[in-house]
Amino acid sequence: MKIAIIGSGIAGLTSAYLLARRHEITLFEASDWIGGHTHTVDVQLDGRDYAIDTGFIVFNDWTYPNFIRLLERLGVASRPTEMSFSVHDPDSGCEYNGNNLNSLFAQRRNLLSPSFLGMLRDILRFNREALRDLAEERIGGDITLGDYLARGRYGRRFVDHYIVPMGAAIWSMSLADMLDFPLQFFVRFFKNHGLLSVNDRPQWRVIAGGSRAYVAPLTASFRERIRLNCPVWLVERDADGVTLLSPAGRERFDKVVFACHSDQALTLWQANTKIGRAHV
């Protein structure tokens, strides 16, 4: 079959890698590079070279089993790393790192700080109650993180110096926007990544040489089928297949894989026919 793949992030590249074995694929990428969130920068410091990842950085053995198998098949090496969370607030002077007790109480005055100790109690309470509420289906789809924190009367130190900045760091959002984040997705993500547990946590890993190291071997078998700077403008579906409109013109394909964000896919999709609406 002739298959169009829209997007060259990990979803698009893996789809192309697997489908290219038996089908004629064409991968469309609107930007001038492939890899999606994969972005590695070379930095020299004190005579040493470092590959710094600024997009996709880490993965773990709990939630990335297929990605780990893919790296093994490609012969791409990875190594274990540590994940920790640090806060420095110049306004309040609060500073800590959650890696161990010594770094948690790096400011020794926090050993006797009611607000800091209250934050630690709130962390344990949130971990316990959020998991329970998720399991008992007491978190509605319309409840936000801010709603839940207000309803649970969590302290300002916990809100401002732990849960909100941690979420903002993970999803690259402002602190204000983080409060409007859907709670159900938030808790499920934290649970799946071991962030609601003090002891039982996954092993985090990084790709040796930076995350870019997997892109070349992954695309080696179909690199000539990749079109850079070639955004898809429109996708039309009919009973016999799909038509794509791009800078290359109108082209027919048997199937299309939307490996882009959902809002982008909906923009491209022509849902003005019965068959289109049924598939949307």
Which sequence ranges carry the predicted segments?
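Core beta-strand elements of the Rossmann-like FAD/NAD(P) dinucleotide-binding domain
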Residues: 247-255
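Helical element adjacent to the flavin cofactor pocket in flavoenzyme catalytic cores
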Residues: 188-246
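N-terminal glycine-rich dinucleotide-binding loop that anchors FAD/FMN and/or NAD(P) in oxidoreductases
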Residues: 41-67
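Flavin (primarily FAD) binding-site architecture
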Residues: 258-273
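Glycine-rich FAD pyrophosphate-binding loop
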Residues: 20-44
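N-terminal Rossmann-like FAD-binding beta1-loop-alpha1 element of flavoenzymes
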Residues: 2-27
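Conserved small/polar residues in nucleotide/adenosyl-binding loops
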Residues: 275-280
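Mobile amphipathic helical/loop "lid" adjacent to a hydrophobic cofactor/ligand pocket
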Residues: 61-183, 187-188
